[in-house]
């Protein structure tokens, strides 16, 4: 398990829905919350992985365009779910999703992961 995934799972806040280490040719689901274990099929997870990794490739191009070498996190906010994508290396990342409401500690989680990522 990556250090970033460990940091997310150890974060003092809401329990993640899903945490996965995404590598350039495969992925490893590190955590699925108990109530969601039967919700996602292997096909769903593989499709999500392919979509996220294609986004990683375009994200690298976008970073060059804006003159930055890295970003701390990408976030997607849905009505009741927030998704984080923490880049860990070129074409590698950690995916984490949580139940979302206005009280979710978004900045605190990003800061904690950024601190940990800087220690590696």
Predicted segments with their positions:
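Non-catalytic interaction/Regulatory regions outside core domains
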Residues: 1-120
